[in-house]
Regions:
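N-terminal leader/linker segments that initiate helical-solenoid repeat arrays
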Residues: 7-62, 77
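Helix-start (N-cap) detector for alpha-helical repeat units in TPR-like alpha-solenoids
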Residues: 25, 57-58, 91, 96, ...
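Residue-level recognition of tetratricopeptide repeat
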Residues: 32-33, 65, 104, 138, ...
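Structural signature of tandem alpha-helical TPR/SEL1-like repeats
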Residues: 39-42, 73-79, 109-118, 143-155, ...
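Canonical positions in the second alpha-helix
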Residues: 47-50, 82-83, 121-122, 155-156, ...
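Structural marker of alpha-solenoid helical repeat scaffolds
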Residues: 52-53, 86-90, 125, 159, ...
Length: 218
């Protein structure tokens, strides 16, 4: 008898059914994610069928990310937020993931204020995700909240020192507030990690141009 069978044999029938159901749902979600990569419209249609069989959290998640893949960013983001706040038995890790993905969808939709609100909620659930701090920084920078963005990037760098993306974003923010020395310092650190990054090389040109304009003519 397999290990799974042995474990199942020691459980009441209802518990065995729950475990099997969760496993089946996870397989179905994995299929949904794979389907989105090749045919998001079909994945969305399948999600509606799945929703009709019980409106389970993973079915709602499949539906939301399929909508995002179909460029229905605002609707997908709203559904992810609703799922993150739902009373279902959803882990804190999953709730944070749903809010983070909602924030990124709002940001892609050109709504950085809504994105920041979603990232705030996600950060209330976890303070150890450097990428999440970078995400909120991006939302703040999109609103020209340069110093708020820099605070988040400092938090990201405290978790992952010398992260080229975080350093590049902070260099861009420092350039925006005319801290050219700080921008140059962060940029050089970023280039040490990713010397051929096109965005960083463009940023270097922008900083040099700002420095040139700042230098008095002879």
């Amino acid at each position: 008898m397999s290990l799974i069978a042995l474990l199942m044999a020691g459980l009441p029938l209802s518990q065995s059914a729950i475990i099997l159901n969760r496993r089946d749902e996870q397989i179905r979600l994995n299929t949904c994610i794979e389907q989105i990569e090749t045919d998001a419209e079909l994945a969305y249609e399948d999600s509606l069928v799945w929703l009709a069989t019980g409106n389970r959290p993973l079915a709602r998640y499949c539906n939301a990310i399929a909508l995002i893949a179909l460029d229905e960013l605002e609707e997908g983001a709203a559904r992810l937020e609703a799922l993150a706040n739902a009373p279902d038995a959803i882990t804190l890790t999953d709730r944070s993931l749903y809010m983070t993905q909602a924030g990124n969808a709002w940001l892609s939709a050109g709504l950085p204020e809504a994105a920041e609100t979603a990232f705030d909620a996600a950060l209330n659930m976890t303070q150890t995700d450097a990428d999440l701090f970078k995400d909120r920084a991006a939302a703040r920078l999109a609103q020209e909240n340069w110093f708020g963005g820099m605070d988040d990037l400092a938090s990201a760098l405290a978790l992952v020192p010398n992260d080229a993306e975080a350093l590049g974003l902070r260099a861009r923010a420092k350039l925006a507030v005319a801290d050219l020395s700080g921008a140059e310092e962060d940029l050089e650190r970023a280039l040490d990690q990713d010397a051929e990054n096109i965005e960083l090389l463009v940023l270097r040109g922008d900083i040099r141009e700002a420095r040139r304009r700042q230098t008095p003519a002879p």
